[in-house]
Amino acid sequence: MKDTKQQFEHVIALCRDLFSKKLHDYGPAWRILRPASVTDQIFIKANRIRSIETKGVTLIDEGIRAEFIAIVNYGIIGLIQLELGYAESADISNEEAMALYDKYAKEALELMLAKNHDYDEAWRSMRVKIGRASCRERVCQYV
């Protein structure tokens, strides 16, 4: 499990870096998003992953990796929005937004490690495309 934790921390660091850069550029503009808007964004990203896998080509020079990063970040935004509720404007500082990001990333890590213990990392035995399809189906189910 040590490798899983390190892999998670590496991926979250990449996601956090992009979140921080966008926060610097735009501020917490996402605070105005309602839960349905956040899940719509996650659905759009998951659907693009499926489209890229199906078609095998893209017209926009951004691959699947960027979409997964966006899904992680929108997921954390969604958790923040559920905690704070949506706002009429960007009502928190960048520092507060980053602290909330870190809080939910830590909670996700703890939950993943607990589930990995109980399920013995069964997800590692799944075929990658099945894992992605399952992820997309779950997004669609909750949207």
Question: Where are each of the predicted segments found?
Answer:
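Intrinsically disordered, low-complexity regulatory regions
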Residues: 1-138
